[in-house]
Amino acid sequence: MAHEKESPLDRAVRAAVNGGCIVYPTETFYALGAKIGNAEALERIIGIKGRPGSKPLPVIIGNMAQLAQVADENARAWPGLKCARELMECFWPGPLSIVLPVRKALPPQLSDAQGLVSVRLTPHPAAREICLRAKTPLVATSANVSGKAPVSDVRFLSPTIRAGVDAVFEGEPRPAGGLASTVVKPVADQEVVVCRAGALPVETLARQGFRLIETP
């Protein structure tokens, strides 16, 4: 009966804490998410979306302290480490996903064959609050069936997605829509591979002194 008095945000947090899958707003689009350490929930997300299992799931964090839960901060030999820190200082929180070495023992659905995971510090107040109250980073893949357009208005959420999750938090402010987050992989001092152009213009990266390598 106590659950009847829960706010929509409370329900989303409880679902995430209990290992469920949720839909929630981010600064770009609505996201489909779960705790990063729950392999079963991550597999559910892949199934709900019809997403290729070989495609890693991106992650958001609610504050910088949560970065250590998803990224291997001891990867001292990684040549992109200094550049990654500079990117974070310049552009986080914001719609910039940075590809980083994944922390050991996390589910394989999060990382690619090189052991890298895409992470961003979200500025969206509701997404941040869910991460902080659930005490974990969250998967943040777009809440759409694979191959379909992402949604910034929950009214257009696919029935397949809605039926497959444990909670939908509509939240305010609504996602901005437009473009997904920009994704970059730091490879050397002030040198980044642009994996996906997006909401943070690559020209902004260049103006801050980062050398850009476009992917083919």
Range-by-range predicted roles:
Residues 1-216:
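Active-site-adjacent structural elements in enzyme catalytic cores
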